[in-house]
From Swiss-Prot:
Gene Ontology molecular function, alphabetical: 5-amino-6-(5-phosphoribosylamino)uracil reductase activity; diaminohydroxyphosphoribosylaminopyrimidine deaminase activity; NADP binding
Keyword vocabulary terms for this entry: NADP, Oxidoreductase, Riboflavin biosynthesis
Gene3D superfamilies given in the database record: Dihydrofolate Reductase, subunit A
Statement: the UniProt record of this protein carries the keyword NADP: yes
Gene from which the chain derives: ribD2
GO biological process: riboflavin biosynthetic process
Record-linked InterPro entries: DHFR-like_dom_sf (IPR024072), Eubact_RibD (IPR004794), RibD_C (IPR011549), RibDG_C (IPR002734), Riboflavin_Biosynth_HTPR (IPR050765)
Family indicated by similarity: Belongs to the HTP reductase family.
Species per Swiss-Prot/TrEMBL record: Buchnera aphidicola subsp. Schizaphis graminum (strain Sg)
Catalytic reaction equation(s): 5-amino-6-(5-phospho-D-ribitylamino)uracil + NADP(+) = 5-amino-6-(5-phospho-D-ribosylamino)uracil + NADPH + H(+)
Protein EC: 1.1.1.193
Residues reported in the UniProt entry to bind substrate: 14, 30, 50, 53, 145
Keyword flag NADP: yes
Name used for this protein in its record: 5-amino-6-(5-phosphoribosylamino)uracil reductase
Pathway note: Cofactor biosynthesis; riboflavin biosynthesis; 5-amino-6-(D-ribitylamino)uracil from GTP: step 3/4
Length: 217
C-alpha cells in the first residue's frame, strides 16, 4: 500500500504500488500457507493466479521449500453472488480451488474446482463458518489476499491473528481505495488496536507485522 494507506487508485489500478522485492517476499508467505483466500471482487478486478511462483525462487528460498515436499496452496474464493467464471485465469490452473458460495450454479467446473455451500450471515457468506470448514480440512495456516471490504470484514469480526503490510514510499491521495473498509463507524474508544511485531525494509518498501492486542487465536 501507499504511505497514506491506499491499495489502489479510484479506477481500481494497483499494478504496481509496491516493489518487485515486496512481491517476491509475498511469494514466501504464500509458500508457507496451507491456503490462500481472496474475494470474487479481486478475481474480477485483477484476474490473478494466486499461486506460488516456485520457479522464480532463489537458491536460499528453494532450500526452505524443497521441491519433493512442496505443494501449491489451495485457493479459496469468497463468491456469494457466483461471479467467478470458468474463463478466469485462476480456474484454468491445475491446483485445487474452493468456491465458497450461498448456492450452486449449473456450470460444469474442472476437476480442480469445487463449489462449497456456506450458510449466510446477513445475506453474505458467514466467514466464521468458512474458517470452521477449512479447519475441518486441517487448513491451519491461511493467507488472505483480498480487497478493502473482505479484509475489513475479517478484521471487524476479529478473525485475524496477524497482519502483514507492505508500505511503498508513494502517496495516492484521498480518492484512492483504502486498505480496510468497515460497514459501521467506529468510535475512537472502540478502534481496533495492534502491537508491532516486526518492521523491516524490503527493497525500497517497509514491511510491518502486527498482531491484535486482544488476540483470540
Amino acid at each position: 500500500m501507499s504511505i497514506d494507506g491506499r491499495i489502489a487508485m479510484k479506477n481500481g489500478e494497483s499494478r504496481w504500488i509496491t516493489s518487485k522485492e515486496s512481491r517476491e517476499d509475498v511469494q514466501k508467505f504464500r509458500a508457507k500457507s496451507s491456503a490462500i483466500l481472496t474475494s470474487s471482487a479481486t478475481i474480477l478486478n485483477d484476474d490473478p493466479l494466486l499461486n506460488v511462483r516456485y520457479k522464480k525462487f532463489d537458491k536460499n528460498t528453494l532450500s526452505t521449500f524443497p521441491k519433493k515436499i512442496f505443494q501449491q496452496p489451495i485457493r479459496i474464493i469468497i463468491d456469494s453472488k457466483n461471479r467467478v467464471k470458468k474463463s478466469h485465469k485462476i480456474i484454468q490452473t491445475k491446483e485445487k480451488i474452493l468456491l465458497m458460495r450461498l448456492k450452486l450454479d449449473k456450470e460444469i467446473w474442472p476437476e480442480n474446482t469445487k463449489q462449497i455451500i456456506i450458510k449466510p450471515y446477513k445475506e453474505n457468506i458467514d466467514l466464521l463458518c468458512v474458517l470452521k470448514f477449512l479447519g475441518n480440512l486441517e487448513i491451519n495456516n491461511l493467507w488472505i489476499e483480498a480487497g478493502s471490504t473482505l479484509s475489513g470484514c475479517f478484521l471487524k469480526l476479529e478473525l485475524i491473528d496477524e497482519i502483514i503490510i507492505y508500505i511503498a514510499p508513494k502517496i495516492l491521495g484521498h480518492e484512492a481505495k483504502p486498505l480496510f473498509i468497515f460497514n459501521n463507524q467506529l468510535k475512537l474508544f472502540d478502534c481496533l488496536k495492534f502491537d508491532f511485531k516486526d518492521i523491516r525494509q524490503i527493497g525500497p518498501d517497509i514491511r510491518i507485522k502486527l498482531e491484535p492486542k486482544n488476540k483470540k487465536f
